[in-house]
Design a protein with these regions (language model features):
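C-terminal segments of enzyme domains that contribute to small-molecule binding surfaces
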Residues: 10-24, 30, 35-36, 40-41, ...
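Left-handed beta-helix
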Residues: 2-3, 7-8, 20, 26, ...
C-alpha cells in the first residue's frame, strides 16, 4: 500500500493485495473484512465493510462503495459515484447490475477469511 499526503483509514481484517493511492486532499477509508485484489488503483474513496474489489479495478476520487459489494475485475468506478449496499458492479464505467445474493455475501466473507488464515499461517514462518 502506498500513499502520499492522504488520510488513510483501514478497517480490521482488511486484505490489501498491493493497491496504490496517490491522490491528495481526499479521505481514503476501507471498512472491515474488505478484500482488495491485485493491481487495483484506488483514489481517495470509501469502501464499505465486507466488500470485494476485483483484480485491476479502478475507483476514483470521492467514490463510495457500500457494504457487502462485489466490484468486478477491471471495473471503473468514476468520480463521486455512489454504489449502494449489496451491489454487484461490473464494466467501464461500472454499473450496478443487481443485488448480490446471500451466497455471494457469504463467499466474500469466506474469501477474506481464507486470506487472513493464510497470512497468519505464513507470517509465523517468516517472522
Amino acid at each position: 500500500m502506498r500513499t502520499q499526503s492522504i488520510t488513510k483509514i483501514t478497517g480490521k481484517d482488511t486484505l490489501n493485495q498491493s493497491f496504490k493511492d496517490r491522490i491528495l486532499k481526499f479521505i481514503f477509508k476501507v471498512g472491515k473484512n474488505v478484500t482488495v485484489g491485485h493491481m487495483v488503483m484506488i483514489h481517495g474513496c470509501t469502501i464499505g465493510d465486507n466488500s470485494l474489489i476485483g483484480i485491476g479495478a479502478v475507483i476514483l476520487n470521492n467514490a463510495k462503495i457500500g457494504k457487502n459489494c462485489l466490484v468486478g475485475a477491471k471495473a471503473l468506478i468514476t468520480e463521486n459515484k455512489e454504489i449502494p449496499d449489496n451491489s454487484l458492479v461490473i464494466g467501464s464505467p461500472g454499473k450496478v447490475i443487481r443485488e448480490i445474493t446471500e451466497d455471494e455475501k457469504k463467499a466474500i466473507i469466506e474469501n477474506t477469511k481464507h486470506y487472513q488464515d493464510n497470512w497468519k499461517k505464513y507470517s509465523k514462518s517468516i517472522f
